[in-house]
C-alpha cells in the first residue's frame, strides 16, 4: 500500500534504536542504521505505484537488469565501498528460499549478518497484524 515502505523503514529504525543499547559492543550504530534504511532501497525500483489509486504492482522492467531488490541494494553498497552494509542487505531475508543472497543457515557468519534480518522480520510480521486489524 502507498506509504508502506516508508512505514516499514521507520519501524526498522525504531527497532534498531531499541536494540542498539544491548548490542552496542557488537555492532557499529551508523552501520546498523544505514542497513535498516537501505535494506529495501531496491523496492523503489522493483515496484510501480499508481499515485491516483495507491495501487502497487511489480515493475516487469526491473527484472531486465536486476534479480531482486536485495541485489540492487547490495550492489549499491558495494559500489560505494560499504561491504558490511551490503552483506547485511544480502542476508536480510534470512534464507535463500526466501530470497536471501546469503543464507543465515550457513555456519560461521559474523554476528552483524543476523540483526537486520530479525529487525526486518519483526516489522513485516507486526505490520501484517496491524494491516489485518484495519479490515
Please annotate each region the language model reported.
Residues 1-11:
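All-alpha helical catalytic cores of prenyl diphosphate-utilizing isoprenoid enzymes
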Amino acid at each position: 500500500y502507498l506509504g508502506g515502505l516508508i512505514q516499514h523503514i521507520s519501524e526498522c529504525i525504531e527497532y534498531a534504536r531499541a536494540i542498539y543499547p544491548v548490542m552496542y559492543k557488537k555492532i557499529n550504530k551508523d552501520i546498523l542504521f544505514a542497513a535498516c534504511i537501505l535494506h529495501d532501497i531496491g523496492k523503489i525500483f522493483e515496484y510501480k505505484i499508481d499515485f491516483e489509486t495507491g495501487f502497487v504492482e511489480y515493475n516487469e522492467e526491473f527484472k531486465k537488469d536486476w534479480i531482486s531488490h536485495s541485489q540492487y541494494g547490495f550492489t549499491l553498497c558495494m559500489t560505494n565501498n560499504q561491504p558490511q552494509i551490503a552483506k547485511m542487505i544480502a542476508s536480510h531475508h534470512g534464507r535463500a528460499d526466501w530470497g536471501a543472497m546469503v543464507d543465515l543457515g550457513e555456519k560461521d557468519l559474523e554476528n552483524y549478518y543476523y540483526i537486520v534480518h530479525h529487525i526486518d522480520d519483526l516489522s513485516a510480521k507486526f505490520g501484517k497484524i496491524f494491516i489485518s486489524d484495519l479490515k
